[in-house]
């Protein structure tokens, strides 16, 4: 199945088209050659040869156009199959892109759920901590809170030593 969906590079496509319709590049080359010869004749001031080469250019372009039309009619079914093949390749690419997008969305969804769970757990823990801290402070006097917030300075340490000796 993978071999059905292999894509061709531009060089492979050019070679395939050259093998399918070799008359078109031949007609283009003949047209270019006729134009080159007409240019050279114009530089040489040979108007008869120049007119002859312009007519040859017209014939070469007619040959190229005829090759394009005949090749189009001859390869009509093959081109239709190739379009269907290219359509399948595009559908496969679109499906792969869609699947990758869905996988990315699922990964982000899992990440978001994990983050929400962690955030909820942290919130519950923080709420319990604040409730526990409020319960401990209910039985304490307001002056003790102030002492705790100030911290222990030198004077506080001396007072604690003096009070400790009295007890």
Curated annotation (Swiss-Prot):
Keywords carried by this UniProt record: Coiled coil, Membrane, Mitochondrion, Transmembrane, Transmembrane helix
Domain HIG1 residue range list: 1-86
Coiled coil: 75-107
GO cellular component: mitochondrial membrane
One Pfam family matching this protein: HIG_1_N
PROSITE patterns for the chain: HIG1
Transmembrane portions of the chain: 21-38, 53-75
Gene Ontology BP annotations: mitochondrial respirasome assembly
The organism of origin for this protein: Talaromyces marneffei (strain ATCC 18224 / CBS 334.59 / QM 7333) (Penicillium marneffei)
Gene behind this protein: rcf1-A
Lipid bilayer topology: Multi-pass membrane protein
Location within or outside the cell: Mitochondrion membrane
InterPro entries xref list: Hypoxia_induced_domain, RCF1
Name of the protein: Respiratory supercomplex factor 1-A, mitochondrial
Major localization listed first in the record, in broad terms: mitochondrion
Protein task: Cytochrome c oxidase subunit which plays a role in assembly of respiratory supercomplexes.
Keyword Cytoplasm: no
